[in-house]
Every structure is written in structure tokens, then in C-alpha cells.
């Protein structure tokens, strides 16, 4: 009787485990599809952002922005978002050149305190 009960318990555990594995396998394609859709949406947004930046920046300014993004990604991303915001709000009358981009960067960065050491 005890052996029969143990066999039933084992069978029940196997069934639950099999059902759990099947649920995970059924869910996995939807997770992969969701990840794929998110990646597609991110790529599309990035393409739109680059298109806007090509319209509002001169080639020299775009080159500076690319260099900035390689060295300081967070600051580069912040500057891109600010430029796009300016363009979408209609506050840009012409393309931004390298000098104007430098000015924007200077405004964005906090003032650095200069420390000098003098020996006596």
C-alpha cells in the first residue's frame, strides 16, 4: 500500500514537472518575440534620431558629437536628446555648426573649479 502511494506521488510530481516545462517552452517563444520587437522598436527610434541629427547638425558638428559619444556616452546621449528637443520645439533657425555645439556642451557641463598649487 505504501509503495503504491509513493508511486502515485512520483507520478504526480512527474506530471507537474512536465506541465511546468511545457509552460516554460510555450512562454519562451513569446519572450523571444517580445525581445525582438523591443529591439526593432529601439533600432527604429535610433534611426529616427540619427535622421533628425543629420538634418540639424553640420558634418563637423556630427563628427564632434560622435567622438563625444565614444568618450562620454551619457553626456553624448544627453546632448542628442537636447538637440532633438530644440529641433522639435522649433527653436532652431539653421543647422548647428561645430562652434554652436561646443557652446551647448559648455553650458551643459558644470563649472569646474580650478585648483592650483603654489610652492613657497
Swiss-Prot record:
GO CC terms of this entry: cytosol
Superkingdom classification of source: Archaea
Name assigned to this protein: DNA-binding protein MM_0803
SUPFAM superfamilies: Double-stranded DNA-binding domain
Pfam families, per the entry: dsDNA_bind
GO terms for MF: DNA binding
NCBIfam families documented for this protein: PRK04239.1
Family label: Belongs to the PDCD5 family.
Source organism: Methanosarcina mazei (strain ATCC BAA-159 / DSM 3647 / Goe1 / Go1 / JCM 11833 / OCM 88) (Methanosarcina frisia)
Keywords: DNA-binding
Amino acid at each position: 500500500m505504501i509503495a503504491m502511494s509513493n508511486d502515485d506521488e512520483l507520478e504526480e510530481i512527474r506530471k507537474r514537472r512536465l506541465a511546468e516545462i511545457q509552460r516554460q517552452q510555450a512562454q519562451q517563444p513569446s519572450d523571444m518575440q517580445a525581445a525582438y520587437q523591443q529591439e526593432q522598436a529601439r533600432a527604429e527610434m535610433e534611426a529616427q534620431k540619427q535622421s533628425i541629427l543629420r538634418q540639424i547638425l553640420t558634418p563637423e558638428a556630427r563628427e564632434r558629437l560622435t567622438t563625444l559619444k565614444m568618450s562620454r556616452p551619457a553626456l553624448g546621449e544627453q546632448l542628442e536628446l537636447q538637440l532633438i528637443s530644440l529641433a522639435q520645439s522649433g527653436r532652431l533657425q539653421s543647422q548647428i555648426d561645430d562652434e554652436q555645439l561646443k557652446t551647448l556642451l559648455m553650458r551643459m557641463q558644470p563649472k569646474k573649479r580650478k585648483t592650483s598649487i603654489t610652492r613657497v
